[in-house]
Amino acid sequence: MNPLRTLLFCTSFCGDEAAWRARQRRWLDHHLALPLEHDAVFVIDDASPFVPADPDVRVLDALPPALPEGPRAFFYRFATHEGRIRLTGHRGWWRSFLFSLDIARAYGFERIVHVESDAFLLSRRIVDRINATTDGWTAYWCPQYGVPEPALQVIAHDQFDAMAAVAERGLDALTVALAELTIPFTRIARGYAGNRYGESR
């Protein structure tokens, strides 16, 4: 079976170059070196004041008809900043997260892998599990808080319509509750430590 055409992405906001180097660039360097299947890598940005000038990253403010060959990653920057309001009001995150579906459909990707910019895949076992995931909407369990962790998700093409239905609810509706309790996951993988901060190993 041929691998699914895969989009790997994180969401982003960085105030300056130091923040970019410490977080998003570090995320890129780590995940680009893994045997994680991907056909394109995007950093989807909530109108940061800083825009990277790294030679292997192409900055986009609109989706072109076809992705140019050459860049190792694309930095898609929205023109306006949504940000965050209180605990659940992650407007910027929701917009960036859901825009991954627009990218996938625009370029024929069949699987979306979301690894948040402060999350890192640390074992070959979880990389192999993600590579082998070809259906459903998968999240990984966070035992520290007893919820699925939305910082690590795999959305296969059979769930793209479900993701579109989430997007149709709009940012105002989506930001009244935690993403952990809102996203309609079809599979929650409990055999892994799905934590960003290392509270549970």
Give the residues covered by each predicted segment.
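Short loop->beta transition adjacent to catalytic acidic/histidine clusters or analogous donor-positioning motifs
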Residues: 5-6, 32-42
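N-proximal low-complexity "stem/linker" segments adjacent to membrane-targeting elements
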Residues: 1-29
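Short beta-strand-to-loop acidic/aromatic patch adjacent to the donor-nucleotide binding site
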Residues: 85, 108-120
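Conserved donor NDP-sugar-binding/catalytic core segment of glycosyltransferases
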Residues: 106-107, 127, 131-140
